[in-house]
């Protein structure tokens, strides 16, 4: 991997910050700078067109700013996160920034959306970012963060404005824009996203005599809460992107099925599975929406097993929880539990069917008028408790276990059944309880249904036949305009017969 540094060939870096990149040297003579800045051909036409999401951005800005009339709202994209030394992770924007800017993939680090209050009421979304510079500038070839010689073609302000429909300004003008009429105009900022932007806002607030730092925490938290809540109900663009994410995720699962014979016998067979899905995610989407769980055998009973360093054995079940994030940053979230050899054993099938019955009960409850989000979980738990009672595993009746003072069934199903889904795999996490768990289901809501049963190998409270079996089934569902709730992942097989046939077909055995 290449490196850069800012000193001449004759100088050794003095500061620790400079020494991060002290493995190579770059000339800094006037002759070199003049030569590097000349004789470049015209840039090719990038062919910028208005994006499909652009038409939805004004309504999103209006919704975000509605409770904060006359206030200036600052939403950073975030910055690169260091993996090691001078190596960073791929940039992924803060989700509220992506929602308001419409920018996806790895765009645009260190940028900021400002919702600027309008005299007539409402807000205008203004995007501040660092555009490309002339190829006669040193930045072009010397700046490994923004220079086109290092990171590839960068857009101009005009190009991004044409793409998004937003007014775009140079990031260097941000501070003056924030300070304009500060004091008369109140400022809010999303905290813990970009330290530099947060510090800038606090400096402006302090100089204007406004509460800042910890004294402004409640003010700022209300903005973050609002940005989360306006994403609870998806617009048409978001729904189409989620559907596309699910479709690509299905392709990834099909590659997993084809990888199973190779995974068996490999000392890290789980990583064979992880790699098969990851390749599809990167080739067809932006990447993974979250770390893939590829949990074979007893590993399925570790809820967030992402080490994926174990073998995949014939006769085991493998639980795969995975989702593709598309370029717009919307992600799917699907779990399927698969028999490695293509056929469920009787005990595996019994556990699997119980979980599937819980899925069906949850979906049925979601389709009843007046259903609240929390009711979906309760419906699934009734089935789980009933099956555990039938099998003689509960120390009390199912009715007693389901009571607030019982909950013994949760030993084998300790997580929630549902969460909202969108730009984040656990979307809208900062929403108030009354807007999330206690809310009535509304058109546009997209969420998961994912009950499970987890019988750990060392669980002495259950018969041996159950030990080491872990099953979760997860689908992504949508509340339609008429109030009905349907699985947008309905094309991904999940019944016992369909899963077995799916594996056989993928492996050419059908």
Task: Label the predicted regions.
Residues 1-510:
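Active-site neighborhoods and metal-handling regions in enzymes and metal-associated proteins
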